[in-house]
Amino acid sequence: MKKFAAVIAVMALCSAPVMAAEQGGFSGPSATQSQAGGFQGPNGSVTTVESAKSLRDDTWVTLRGNIVERISDDLYVFKDASGTINVDIDHKRWNGVTVTPKDTVEIQGEVDKDWNSVEIDVKQIRKVNP
């Protein structure tokens, strides 16, 4: 009885690939399909410093401009054409990128509003061409 069950199991396993080939899969060298991964479309819009200051707490923003000054360990001054805002950039967010005040950067992060101040908690930073 055990041999019979084993033979049935082997037959079931051997017939599964044959059934799968009939329903799809690879059928020859010319059957390659182009599969592009990821999102294809416009990027999120870049926000200005002036408008970021009026957004709600925890709103996700993308800013493009320059980091012009270091205030403390993780706190910097970010400037674009509309004004300046403090940005909090943890050490782990730099990812080996070295930035000078002359470099144009794009930062993504969340608006962090306290009762008397607004800053951006940066999650990603990268250099961009001006």
From Swiss-Prot:
GO terms for cellular component: outer membrane-bounded periplasmic space
Signal peptide (UniProt feature, chain positions): 1-20
Subcellular location(s) per record: Periplasm
InterPro entries named in the record: BOBF_sf, BOF, Ca-regulated_OB-fold, YgiW/YdeI
A GO biological process held by the record: single-species biofilm formation on inanimate substrate
Polar residues bias locations: 29-44
Sorted UniProt keywords: Periplasm, Signal
Region annotation Disordered: where it falls in the sequence: 25-44
Entry's family note: To H.influenzae HI_1709.
The protein, known as: Protein YgiW
